[in-house]
């Protein structure tokens, strides 16, 4: 009886990769069914993730410069997650926004609702955030046309 030493999975893959005449067949699999398979080609993102600028918290979308002069802003509009909007914030205005909602086009900061106090159609900013706070920027997780899974892995 021949006694062969076992080869690790890692070494088997190295050996197979180095065989020039070895022709690997490619198949399409769902990611959750691809355990222990090798990726035949780079997988490239077709979209940005997130696909648009959105709020990371419930609160108020603002123009950060507005709160340097006045901590109280007018509000009468709101944006919820799933709303497909193209709003712009006016000077001195805040827009009520919810987690995952698309940011107004020119807004650059979201104030967490816990740091505000409302009275009628006015919102008082109790704690001013830094510019860009509580915003998820389009493509910050994955940029369109970038490799997300590399061939051979």
Spell out what each predicted region is.
Residues 1-69, 121:
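Short, low-complexity N-terminal leaders and the immediately following helix N-cap/first helix
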Residues 2-3, 60-153:
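Short, glycine/charged-enriched hinge/interface segments at domain edges or termini
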């Amino acid at each position: 009886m021949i006694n062969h030493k076992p080869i690790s999975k890692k070494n088997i893959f190295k050996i197979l990769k180095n065989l020039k005449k070895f022709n690997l067949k490619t198949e399409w699999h769902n990611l959750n069914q691809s355990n222990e398979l090798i990726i035949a080609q780079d997988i490239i993102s077709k979209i940005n993730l997130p696909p648009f600028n959105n709020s990371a918290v419930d609160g108020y979308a603002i123009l950060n410069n507005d709160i340097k002069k006045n901590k109280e802003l007018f509000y009468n509009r709101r944006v919820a997650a799933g709303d497909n909007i193209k709003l712009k914030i006016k000077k001195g205005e805040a827009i009520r926004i919810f987690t995952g909602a698309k940011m107004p086009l020119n807004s650059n900061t979201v104030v967490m609702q816990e740091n505000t106090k409302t009275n009628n159609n006015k919102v008082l900013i109790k704690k001013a955030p830094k510019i860009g706070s509580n915003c998820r920027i389009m493509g910050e997780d994955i940029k369109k046309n970038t490799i997300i899974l590399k061939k051979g892995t």
